């Protein structure tokens, strides 16, 4: 009993000692720092603790120990002790899911990542063995190899093509001399706001009202003007001058403005960069003071301030430095009326003579002439400017501007039949018959100078009363469009009129329909005044039977086309004291209506009086005017004839049939070779003005000696403009396009310090 107790005690002690000996290092390795040396609860006197910290024995034992691995170690030690085996620590198999302990000398190779993880985890110069890399994409960059961009995964993007209306600079073949001072000049008819509204039904009805509003168009115009970045800008049809001046003031421009005389509220304006030029002289021409209608022109002298040593953002010096240049800038909007070549010539002649005088006053400063000239390239008026001389002998007065070759574009009936259907209905709600529409169209044309040649392609003829009243931008082009279905094309021109009991429009209502608005357009007032001046009262009351086809016919003579219509209507009128026949109608056109007649008609229109009797108009005619009409009843109209007064208007001398000027002028666009689809055979733009009833060229920039053309802004191709029925568009803010030229001062014109 005692022996067994002793053996048990010895075995227990040995076991405890062995267990303590074996578990001591395990205890030491496994115990966390706060519990090192503590005795844990458990069987026997040996303390036990638990830890999941990995440990690497410094003595070389690399046993991987977990929190409960010492149970197996004690069991194995007791088993080997019982069988007399020497002590050897057992190394349990390594758990492949466990991470190895940190060792700076340990080379750890993780398993190869999945195929989709190559680019994210793969390290430089470390490739797992026995792997196939053919299917794996290469890494984007290696430290030991040259970098190359990754291959494009998508198709190669093509270069963005330029829009069809993109405008590029076109350069002259001869560049200016090095060091020449250059400046950019612009000419632009920006379309007056009130004209756009007044002519919306005839010229711009395809354009939404909001896009035709001044706010919308102003933003487009200001953006475009800023884009071209001209140093000098000559603008026509400017009625919102204060708005435009404020916008351009923030962009460094100063400006002057001259409003037209008469009832119009638009005019011409000249802008210039304040840090490039300063204004040294200014004057304007009011042509009405010379008996040349209500158009105006501007003349100013600008002196350069920006030298090669001055930056554009610097304030210019108050006084000009030695070697500065001066330039005379002229801006004009010529009368529209295509048959009044005498007034057109008179206006241009007056401006050129005045510009030459101003140039002489300022030491022969070179001249730049900009504007809307309402004449076609190579017309007699164009040739007068370029060739310095024009002979009126044998030249028809209505052929001076070349507008007989203008292209008018009558609106298609389907575009507005529904829109204007209510305007063409009678009071009983029935649509007016064709003959009434024809009569209405003729009454719309009651102010037309019946001496106008039937082949004139003015916008007045096909586009009804609104254009008949005159849109001065409508003038010239190269082609002639057919005048078919003109009766339906002109329906919208009679929308505010009602037939009388006889089915015809009354004379009183017809006259009231010709009332000039309080804010009369420049086009409208110019053309109306032209037309009022060019016809007598009797002719105004006798041509309402003319048909649109006769107006548009390019092959019929004007007298024969109207003669069959005059007698019937004259009989209906029964005007006492007036003896009218065909020649009478055409005779009073030119000389019967003087300034007194214009004053009378202006008052009549302004008062808006409804005349109830057809004879009231005659009773109000001044005696002098009436007698002139009666005395001329036997004169037959000839479009080639010139009265002494008309010759004096054109040439300045009633005894002289030639008109001359002293300036050597060149059109800047004709000096620069351009694309075939943007230029005509003369080098001028194919189109500078485009709306519903016209497409052609009327705008120019001219330069005198002392200046050299460097480059011009290419016009918009005609095909690119024809995608829309007419301008303005959501992109372009006017029915004209801007002409821009860069000019250089010639060294011979360098001025000494004054």
Swiss-Prot record:
Residues 50-61, 162-171 have a biased composition (Basic and acidic residues). It is found in: Nucleus; Cytoplasm. Gene3D superfamilies: Endonuclease/exonuclease/phosphatase. It is an enzyme of class 3 (hydrolase). GO terms for cellular component: cytoplasm; nucleus. Belongs to the CCR4/nocturin family. Mg(2+) binds at residue 237. Its EC number is 3.1.13.4. It catalyses: Exonucleolytic cleavage of poly(A) to 5'-AMP. Transmembrane segments: none annotated. It comes from Arabidopsis thaliana. PANTHER family: CARBON CATABOLITE REPRESSOR PROTEIN 4 (PTHR12121), CARBON CATABOLITE REPRESSOR PROTEIN 4 HOMOLOG 6 (PTHR12121:SF85). Keywords: Cytoplasm, Exonuclease, Hydrolase, Magnesium, Metal-binding, Nuclease, Nucleus, Repeat, RNA-binding, Transcription, Transcription regulation. Its main location: nucleus. Component of the CCR4-NOT complex, at least composed of CRR4 and CAF1 proteins. This is Carbon catabolite repressor protein 4 homolog 6. It comes from the Eukaryota. The lineage of its organism: Eukaryota, Viridiplantae, Streptophyta, Embryophyta, Tracheophyta. Its cofactor is Mg(2+). It holds the Pfam family Exo_endo_phos. Residues 96-106, 116-133, 415-431, 503-525, 534-545 have a biased composition (Polar residues). Acts as a catalytic component of the CCR4-NOT core complex, which in the nucleus seems to be a general transcription factor, and in the cytoplasm the major mRNA deadenylase involved in mRNA turnover.
